[in-house]
C-alpha cells in the first residue's frame, strides 16, 4: 500500500432538526394545548486511532466527510431522530490541525482513542417548550443549530522507539531487516528507501521495541534537498536516534564529512530532534580489512570528536547486531511508562486560579437559557 503521511479533508457535521409548532386536536377537546416536538441532533464527526492503519491514503482521495442532518420535530410530542455520527479511522500518531489557520485540533496517541472534531448541531425547540401560565397556545419555535464545518490537515508521525538516521546507502534498511520483521527494499544504489519503514524488534516473549527507517539525508535536506527532510518528522517521537555511518563508501567520500553534514542538517531542521539521545553505529565493517578496522574506527571517532556510545557492526553479516539490540532495549526499557510525548502545540496552558468565571457557562444566544 502506498505510504501517505499528509492529507487535507473537509468535515461537515449535520445540522439540528427544526422544532415544530403543533397543537393537540382531539374530539371534545377544543383547547388541547401545544404538542410540537423538538428537532433531532445533527450527526457529529469523530476521529478514532486504529493500530492497524499506517497510512493516510484513504483520505487523499476521499476528502469530503459529511454527516446527516437531524430530523425535524413533529406533532403529538414526537421528537426528531438524531442523525448517525461519522467515525473516521486514522493511524495512531495522526495530528489534526486547521488547514487555514494551522491551529491544532487534536492528535491521536493511543489505539482506540476517540476525539470529536466536528460537533453536530442541536435540535431546535418545538412550541411545547414555550408554554407558560400566561401563554397557553405558544406559536414560537426555534430552528436547528448548524453543525460545525472545518477544513483540516492530517499529518502522520509514526510512533517508534528508535529512529535510524544517516546518508543514503548507509545500510539503514539492511539493519532494520536484520534485527526486525520488516522487509524493506534493499539495493546497492542511493535512495532505495522512498518512505518510512517500521519494524518490531523482539528481544524476548514480552520484550520488544519499534524501529523507524526513514529515507537517507543529504546536505541541504533542511532546505528541501533530497527526500529525507519530508520524513524527519517521523523521528520526533522516538526515544533514541541511531546515526549510521558507512565505513566503506563505494566512492572516495569522507565518512566524517558526511556525518558532520547529517548532524548539521538535523540541527537546522529541529533543535529538539538534535538534542535527542544519539548513538553512533559504524556499519559495513565486514568490508574493511581486519587489520585496518581498529585504526579506522579510532580515526573516525577522533576526527568526528564523538564522545557518546559507539557500536561497530555489519548489518549484512549481523556481526555486532545482537549487542546493539540489547543495548537499545535497555535504553528503551528505562522509560517505565509507554507515554508518548505530545506535540508541543497541544500543551494545555495552566489554569488561572484568579479567574472567577464559571467553567461551563451557557451561551448568551442559546434560547434555553434566556
Curated annotation (Swiss-Prot):
InterPro entries (alphabetical): G_OBG (IPR031167), GTP-bd (IPR006073), GTP-bd_Obg/CgtA (IPR014100), GTP1-OBG_CS (IPR006074), GTP1_OBG_dom (IPR006169), GTP1_OBG_dom_sf (IPR036726), OBG_GTPase (IPR045086), P-loop_NTPase (IPR027417)
Region named Disordered: 346-370
tRNA processing keyword on record: no
GO cellular component: cytoplasm
Ligand binding (GTP): 166-173, 191-195, 213-216, 283-286, 314-316
UniProt entry tagged with the keyword rRNA-binding: no
Transmembrane segments: none
Stretch forming the signal peptide: none
Alphabetical UniProt keywords: Cytoplasm, GTP-binding, Hydrolase, Magnesium, Metal-binding, Nucleotide-binding
UniProt-listed Enzyme Commission number(s): 3.6.5.-
Start and end residues of each OBG-type G domain: 160-333
Domain Obg: residue ranges: 1-159
Residues engaged in binding Mg(2+): 173, 193
CDD domains linked to this entry: Obg
Top-level taxon of origin: Bacteria
GO molecular function terms listed in the Swiss-Prot or TrEMBL record: GTP binding; GTPase activity; magnesium ion binding
Subcellular location: Cytoplasm
Record family assignment: Belongs to the TRAFAC class OBG-HflX-like GTPase superfamily. OBG GTPase family.
Name of this chain's protein: GTPase Obg
Amino acid at each position: 500500500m502506498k505510504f501517505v503521511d499528509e492529507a487535507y479533508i473537509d468535515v461537515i457535521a449535520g445540522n439540528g432538526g427544526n422544532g415544530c409548532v403543533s397543537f393537540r386536536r382531539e374530539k371534545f377537546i377544543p383547547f388541547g394545548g401545544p404538542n410540537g416536538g423538538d428537532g433531532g441532533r445533527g450527526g457529529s464527526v469523530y476521529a478514532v486511532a486504529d493500530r492497524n492503519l499506517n497510512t493516510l491514503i484513504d483520505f487523499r482521495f476521499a476528502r469530503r466527510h459529511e454527516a446527516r442532518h437531524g430530523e425535524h420535530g413533529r406533532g403529538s410530542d414526537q421528537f426528531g431522530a438524531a442523525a448517525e455520527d461519522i467515525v473516521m479511522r486514522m493511524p495512531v500518531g495522526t495530528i489534526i490541525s486547521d488547514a487555514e489557520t494551522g491551529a491544532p485540533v487534536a492528535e491521536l496517541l493511543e489505539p482506540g482513542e476517540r476525539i470529536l472534531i466536528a460537533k453536530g448541531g442541536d435540535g431546535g425547540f418545538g412550541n411545547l417548550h414555550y408554554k407558560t401560565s400566561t401563554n397557553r397556545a405558544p406559536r414560537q419555535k426555534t430552528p436547528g443549530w448548524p453543525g460545525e464545518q472545518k477544513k483540516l490537515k492530517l499529518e502522520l508521525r509514526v510512533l517508534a522507539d528508535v529512529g535510524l538516521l544517516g546518508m543514503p546507502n548507509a545500510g539503514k534498511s539492511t539493519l532494520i531487516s536484520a534485527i526486525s520483521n520488516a522487509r524493506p527494499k534493499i539495493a546497492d544504489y542511493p535512495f532505495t528507501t522512498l518512505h518510512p519503514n517500521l519494524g518490531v524488534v523482539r528481544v524476548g516473549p514480552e520484550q520488544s521495541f519499534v524501529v523507524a527507517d526513514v529515507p537517507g539525508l543529504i546536505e541541504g535536506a533542511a532546505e528541501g534537498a533530497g527526500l529525507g527532510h519530508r520524513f524527519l518528522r517521523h523521528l520526533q517521537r522516538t526515544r533514541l536516534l541511531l546515526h549510521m555511518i558507512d565505513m566503506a563508501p563505494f566512492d572516495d567520500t569522507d565518512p566524517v564529512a558526511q556525518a558532520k553534514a547529517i548532524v548539521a542538517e538535523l540541527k537546522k531542521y529541529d533543535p529538539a530532534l538534535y538534542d535527542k539521545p544519539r548513538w553512533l553505529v559504524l556499519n559495513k565493517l565486514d568490508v574493511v580489512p581486519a587489520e585496518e578496522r581498529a585504526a579506522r574506527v579510532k580515526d573516525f571517532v577522533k576526527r568526528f570528536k564523538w564522545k557518546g556510545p559507539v557500536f561497530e557492526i555489519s548489518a549484512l553479516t549481523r556481526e555486532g547486531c545482537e549487542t546493539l539490540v540489547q543495548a537499545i532495549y535497555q535504553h528503551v526499557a528505562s522509560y517505565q511508562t509507554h507515554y508518548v510525548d505530545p506535540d508541543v502545540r497541544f500543551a494545555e496552558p495552566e489554569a488561572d486560579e484568579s479567574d472567577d468565571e464559571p467553567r461551563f457557562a451557557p451561551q448568551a444566544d442559546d434560547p434555553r437559557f434566556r
